Amino acid sequence: MKFERHLLLTLREELSKPTPVIHVLIGPRQVGKTTIALQIQESVKIPTIYATADSPVPLDSSWIETHWKRAVTESHASKSPVILILDELQKVKGWSETLKMLWDSRLGGPEIRVLILGSASLLMQEGLTESLAGRFFLHRCSHWS
């Protein structure tokens, strides 16, 4: 039997319907953020793309753009919305500006639902408040209890 946290149920429900915001899952390292994301990926009925920026080489905005294009292509092919999950996004240089540009350009295009994960809360929150104000909903993942 798999353990499912309440946060998983909340996020799965939110991402299974049209959403006007980017969902952001933040919390300390090793609390289960990636596990929740992978459980969402295997349990929703719409296509999901998962990518992690946890890389030994620095990544830039083209990494985000590549995965966004994958989501758009998948949405056209499947004729359905797509969930794009980007893990450890704070490691990508210029991530918030790039995501803002892509998010704002989606109107009239395929429905891309976005979940971003990050463990460096300060870096995530700075990017969220600077570029993505009004475009996100913050979910906090605490230690297992």
Whereabouts are the PLM-identified features?
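Phosphate-binding site recognition
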Residues: 1-145
